Amino acid sequence: MFEGAMPALITPFTKDDRIDREGLQRNIEFVEEGGVAGIVPCGTTGESATLSALEHEEVIDIAVECSKVPVIAGTGSNNTGEALQFTKHAADAGVDGVLLISPYYNKPNPAGLLTHFKKIAEAVDVPMVMYNIPSRTGQDMPLEVIVELAKVENIVGIKEASGNIGKVSQILENTIDEDFVVISGEDNLTLPILSVGGQGVISVAANIVPDRMSRMVNAALAGDYETARKIHFEIAPLIRALFLETNPIPVKKAAELAGLASGNLRLPLAPLSETNTQKVADELRKLGVIE
């Protein structure tokens, strides 16, 4: 279930700033046709930080209702009580797993991190993937904390976006006796992470090129690194373009250009600049995504 390419879904909005239910369903169908192994609603790319609690639940409900692949729902928060509430709802909705970001802004000490994740894991019987992304949280989860949490039965993995391949290797080295997976949280480092034992990626680019991202990951997992490298270099310029500004600003514009459901960004995020829009469009044309 936690192997392969899984898009961190964008959340499309209608013109009156509501969840675009039909658009989200179309986007899910598109990535499924591209061969993705699962979908991840309500993550950073899904603008979860600016969704209301009811909208958060609505997006997860839509994903579960229409998806033909496993759903791993983002249920994290910097408020343990809120994260627990989101996780309980997701489990009741029938998700296959949840993704829990390390609490942001608060910068908890190691004891706080351990208690946060353990409390949620003990309260809700659902497979949980932790999410380490220091650029968003202001804190890199300590290796010792990750290794300790890997021993918890239903904490089954971590999405790693620290940018530190050495740390990824250490996590894998120190959890080799656990049933624990490491999933890339950075498109540009997915292939290196797979090469040291990672099992997949929760991907921004897979919203736009799900077929290529899926083929790259599947090739690497099968040991065909020649094919994987070829695809990696093919899509690398697009990946760079998708991070010219804060995620998900560029990918929502890319989705719009590609004819997918997108809609406005929620403030305080503002639209992609004209210069960067042209750069994104250029990379989409090179890949044949648009004419």
From Swiss-Prot:
Gene Ontology BP terms: diaminopimelate biosynthetic process; lysine biosynthetic process via diaminopimelate
UniProt family annotation: Belongs to the DapA family.
Protein name in the entry: 4-hydroxy-tetrahydrodipicolinate synthase
Pathway, per record: Amino-acid biosynthesis; L-lysine biosynthesis via DAP pathway; (S)-tetrahydrodipicolinate from L-aspartate: step 3/4
Cross-referenced SMART domains: DHDPS
GO molecular function: 2-dehydro-3-deoxy-phosphogluconate aldolase activity; 4-hydroxy-tetrahydrodipicolinate synthase activity
EC id: 4.3.3.7
Gene symbol of the encoding locus: dapA
Subcellular location: Cytoplasm
